[in-house]
Amino acid sequence: MTYEQIDGLISFVSNSPGQPTGYGQQGAMLVERMVRHGINVAALSNYGLEGVAGELEFAGKKIPHYPRGFKQYSDDVIQPWHEDFVGQNPGVPDAVFTLYDVWVYNDVPPRNDFPTKFISWVPLDHQSLPPAVAKWLLRPNVTPITMSPHGQRQLEAAGIASTYIPHAIDTKVFKPRETMSDGVNAREYLGVKPDEFLVGVVSANKANGLIHRKAYSELVLAWSIFLKSYPKSKLYIHTEPSGIMGGFDLPVLLQACGVPHESVIFPERDRLRKGYSQEDMAALYSAFDVLANPSYGEGFGVPAVEAQACGTRVICSGWAASADLVAEDGLLLQGVPFWDEPQKAWWSIPLVDSIFNALVEAYKAERGPSKVAREFASQFDAERVWKWGWLPFLREFFK
């Protein structure tokens, strides 16, 4: 197949494309298509393969991979790495593309010292716009791309123009699947009986040691209450259970809430560390009767879309990006405002009774794959999003 070619150069600043993180997976899908359409791409890593100065392969071509810098978010090396890449490809229209929280880039030299254009695919996970985020997006050489309708509305209210292009998934992979890649039935793999109600959670256990954006404490407390009335239920939490990455010690939290250890399942630690394949994740999503994804605020929330593509209904927060990412048969939570002092903006905390009520409603609902959820998730197919979103945007940007 012959693809339209775009004459452009992009330094892609994010997690290393292809790594088993949300940004890594989004980066891989996007970089693959950029390279396919003739754009020169270099990966500027802030996580994943951060020590590697070498090459990655996408669309049958080698692209350079630059290592991280000395600062936490590698913003100290954006300018030198980009200028190095541009120097190897003189005369090509260029840009730096960021897929990360943009407040970390406010120390990047201003346009007078670093005149390169920036494209920032920005997560907006608060109910009000953080000033540090607005500061970056208001730079005259920054073009914002919002990944949710919520984000676009939020920027519009602040007088900041943006283009909406959502995160994407591969719907050829994320679809109803009964078995893992080794042929084992997913529910059997988890040790869940056919008549048991299975709630799944796919949320990173990363926090600042005090506040957990993924609302694990509220979810676990709600689960402890739910389990008393519906004991034939299991909770699968697809995350690292210890607090080793700055998150919560989930076994201690579960014990503090009186949750029997046999009602909770965690993934195999070594397998989790290496990363479950997307096919195996699709099988796990398909095994869930519902995905519980409460949060103080989401910039997007890929697991909710992946689960729905597999026919699994979801429970999500009814604010920030999540509110626009739930099908009609999904469930939205209520919350109370919470001030995020470091970001100077509002989140919301999901109410425990709202999570409990959503679990009960999901328990009483019809089981099995949801056609409504699958149809809703189809709009986020990677090739569809590329054709209606990224391709026309990049064509116009580099013309």
Q: Can you name each region flagged by the protein language model?
A:
Residues S11, K193-K214, V220-W223, L235-I237:
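Conserved donor-binding/catalytic core segment of Leloir-type glycosyltransferases
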Residues H150, A168:
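Carbohydrate-associated surface elements
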Residues K175-V192:
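A short helix/loop element that forms part of the nucleotide-sugar donor recognition site in Leloir-type
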Residues G247-A283:
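Nucleotide-activated donor-binding/catalytic signature segment of Leloir-type glycosyltransferases, i.e.
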Residues Y296:
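Aromatic "clamp/platform" in nucleotide-sugar-dependent glycosyltransferases that forms part
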Residues A304, R313-C316, V326, L331:
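Short hydrophobic beta-strand element within catalytic cores of glycosyltransferases
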Residues P350, K364-L394:
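A charged, aromatic-enriched C-terminal amphipathic alpha-helix characteristic of glycosyltransferases
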